[in-house]
Swiss-Prot record:
Pathway(s) of this molecule: Glycan biosynthesis; glycogen biosynthesis
Signal peptide span: none
The name this protein goes by in its record: Glycogen synthase
EC number: 2.4.1.21
InterPro entries, A to Z: Glyco_trans_1, GS/SS, Starch_synth_cat_dom
């Protein structure tokens, strides 16, 4: 089966969140099942220094009043074909943000649609998050191309309908308040990145005002758990680690803990309880909860805490204050570093993920793979992947709490600290966590089943009257009434992309 992945990220070259890992690893697993899988991403300027890219474009065309060129290259690890949409708008050293973000990704989606129609026609076009959300709308008119839309994070929903109409062609049949809503309505299948998250987003607590729409499309909504590349992330062979280890040979793991403590300026002592955190430093990840409980935890236990990541400046500053107030106990490194992240997974005793919401989460899978016990909130994909520790029955893989409250998180931390005192049972807990097999192969087979369901099939158009019931609406900003939301767009450019009308 011919499958084209369209996304804003692809690890390791372009990665901000978990989507980059999915777009890199899932196609490789699908290719091993015998499918012809290719990727298309924006041609970010930094890629020309990282990849061997064709000198001349393989396709040049116009859309949304601007010219684009498509270049071909290969993924550095999977060797799968990657197509890069080239345009000066992708030149700055950024992936997200900027005043032109809405235009930039809508342009990428439009260029991808033109490429799929005219150059390499897939049977399934797999779109990821709002950046590619208009593609299912346009492909709704093409019976030969089916679409799958994956929700990685429902919070980010793309430009509203009024803005889309001034940037690009919105077909007469299109409905939905914004890009994310339109994608969910017109994709032939929609999936969230874990079974629990697919249920949560149908509720008001996690639905981001889209719960009504998600219940309306529930018949085509799926939940498929993310995985990890077990070869790429293997503590027995990972060359980045000071000492390799496995579930059958744990004795050398302590060398990684000592190396981590030394590098982060902590007291080098294997008996200290070392907690790690890697990721975006934002409210979603529960960094504010960590800030509220850290001083008490450090005062009443012998714990050490290491934090790696970037994000909200207020949270970063608060973490710095903690590090200054607790030298040798609390360390923070405000950047992303692959080597250091691996060292935290391999050297920490436990891994912190007190998330407000978590579509799937990959960090907890990597932590378990490397023997760091996850301490998580029971939400989203964390529910599907972390089994609560039961010392009596000697089962479970981590520590879980329910409410997003400091006292609940603190209680889970103290429970884990007490469990760490019992070294023999703690090692058994580590071994159970390390032997969990959340590979992409299992997930790929579920995606394959979904592709077969939709190949050659188009979902009926949504009922516009029913959809209107779920509209939350947003009026156009009067100050933008005469603004042109494109690069070199003339007044009638929204008509230039019309097809099959």
């Amino acid at each position: 089966m011919r499958v084209l992945f369209a996304a804003a990220e692809c690890a390791p070259m372009v990665k901000v969140g978990g989507m980059g890992d999915v777009v890199a690893s899932l196609p490789s697993a699908l290719a091993k099942l015998g499918h012809d899988v290719r990727l298309i991403i924006p041609g970010y300027s930094k890629l020309w220094g990282l990849l061997d890219i064709s000198k001349d474009p393989i396709y040049t065309a116009q859309t949304m009043g601007a010219e684009f060129s498509v270049y071909e290259t290969k993924h550095p690890t999977s060797n799968l074909p990657i197509y890069l949409v080239g345009h000066p708008v992708f030149d700055p050293e950024r992936i997200y943000g900027g005043e032109d973000e809405d235009w930039r990704f809508t342009f990428f989606a439009s260029a991808t649609a033109e490429f799929a129609w005219n150059v390499w026609k897939p049977q399934v076009l797999h779109c990821h998050d709002w950046h590619t959300g208009m593609i299912p709308v346009w492909m709704h008119q093409d019976p030969e191309i089916s679409t799958v839309f994956t929700i990685h994070n429902l919070k980010y929903q793309g430009p509203w309908r009024w803005k889309l109409e001034r940037m690009t062609w919105c077909p007469w049949y299109m409905s939905g308040d914004h890009t994310m809503a339109a994608a969910m309505l017109f994709a032939d299948r929609v999936n969230a990145v874990s079974p629990t998250y697919s249920r949560e987003i149908r509720t008001s607590e996690y639905g981001e005002s889209l719960e009504g729409l998600l219940n309306y499309i529930s018949g085509k909504l799926r939940g498929i758990l993310n995985g990890i590349d077990l070869d790429e992330w293997d503590p027995a062979t990972d060359k980045a680690l000071p000492a390799n280890f496995s579930s059958g040979k744990m004795s050398t793991r302590k060398k990684n803990k000592e190396a981590l403590q030394r590098q982060m300026g902590l007291e080098v002592n294997n008996d200290k309880y070392l907690l790690g955190m890697v990721g975006r430093l934002v409210d979603q990840k529960g960094v504010d909860l960590l800030l509220q409980v850290s001083r008490r935890l450090l005062a009443y236990t012998d714990s050490q805490i290491v934090v790696l990541g970037t994000g909200d400046q207020i949270l970063e500053s608060a973490l710095w204050e903690l590090a200054i107030d607790h030298p040798g106990r609390f360390a923070v490194f405000l950047t992303y570093d692959d080597y250091l992240s691996r060292l935290i997974y391999a050297g920490s005793d436990a891994f912190l993920m007190p998330s407000r919401f978590e579509p799937c989460g990959i960090s907890q899978l990597l932590a378990m793979r490397y023997g760091s016990i996850p301490i998580v909130r029971n939400v989203g994909g964390l529910v599907d992947t972390v089994i609560p520790h039961d010392p009596i029955n000697k089962s479970g893989t981590g520590f879980c709490f329910d409410r997003f409250e400091p006292i609940d998180f603190y209680t889970a931390l103290v429970r884990s600290w007490e469990a760490f005192r019992h070294r023999r049972s703690w090692k058994e807990l580590q071994k159970r966590a390390m032997t969990q097999m959340y590979s992409w192969e299992r997930s790929a087979m579920e995606y394959e089943t979904m592709y077969k369901e939709v190949s050659g099939y188009k979902e009926p158009s949504p009922d516009a009257i029913e959809v209107e019931k779920f509209s939350v609406g947003q009026d156009a900003d009067p100050s933008l009434k005469n603004e042109k939301l494109s690069v070199g767009q003339d007044e009638d450019s929204s008509l230039k992309n019309e097809r099959f009308i």
